[in-house]
Curated annotation (Swiss-Prot):
Matches recorded under InterPro entries: Histone_chaperone_domain_CHZ (IPR019098)
Primary localization class, coarse: nucleus
Pfam families per UniProt: CHZ
Similarity comment text for this entry: Belongs to the CHZ1 family.
UniProt feature, compositional bias: Basic and acidic residues: 23-33
Subcellular location: Nucleus
Biased segments, Polar residues type: 1-11
Keyword set includes Chaperone: yes
Function: Forms a chaperone-bound H2A.Z-H2B complex that acts as a source for SWR1 complex-dependent H2A to H2A.Z histone replacement in chromatin.
Gene giving rise to this polypeptide: chz1
Full protein name: Histone H2A.Z-specific chaperone chz1
Biased segments, Acidic residues type: 34-64, 98-109
Alphabetical keyword list: Chaperone, Nucleus
Length: 115
C-alpha cells in the first residue's frame, strides 16, 4: 500500500521527515494556546486599579452631610405647579386645535400637477 493511506502517528509523521520540516507548523493541526505572561499581568493590574477606584468612591460618600429630610419641604396634595391650577381638558383641546391647524397648512402647500 502507499504511504498516503496510512494513519498518522507521532512516529509515522510524513511532515517530520519532509525536507522542509517547517511545513509541519503550517495548515491544520492541534491548536496550542501560547500563554502570554504580559497579558496576565495587565489583567491583574487592571483588577487592582478597579478595586482601588471603588474604595475611593466609598470614601467620597463619607464626606457628604446626610441630615434627615424636614417634613416642611415635602409638598402635600400632589401639587407640583407652585399653586397654579391647570385645566387638563383645556390643554388637550388646545393641542388638538394646533394639530388641526398643522394639517390645514400641509394641504395648502400641496399643489397637484396637471399632466
Amino acid at each position: 500500500m502507499s504511504e498516503s493511506n496510512q494513519a498518522t502517528f507521532q512516529g509515522n509523521d510524513p511532515a517530520a521527515h519532509a525536507p522542509d520540516a517547517a511545513a509541519y507548523d503550517k495548515g491544520k493541526g492541534k491548536a496550542v494556546e501560547d500563554m502570554d505572561v504580559s497579558m496576565d499581568e495587565e489583567e491583574e493590574e487592571s483588577e487592582e486599579s478597579d478595586a482601588e477606584i471603588m474604595v475611593e468612591d466609598e470614601d467620597d460618600d463619607g464626606d457628604s452631610n446626610l441630615e434627615p429630610v424636614s417634613t416642611e419641604n415635602i409638598i402635600s396634595g400632589g401639587r407640583r405647579t407652585r399653586g397654579k391650577t391647570i385645566d387638563y381638558q383645556e390643554a388637550a383641546n388646545k393641542i388638538d386645535a394646533d394639530e388641526m391647524d398643522d394639517e390645514e397648512d400641509d394641504d395648502e402647500d400641496f399643489k397637484p400637477s396637471d399632466k
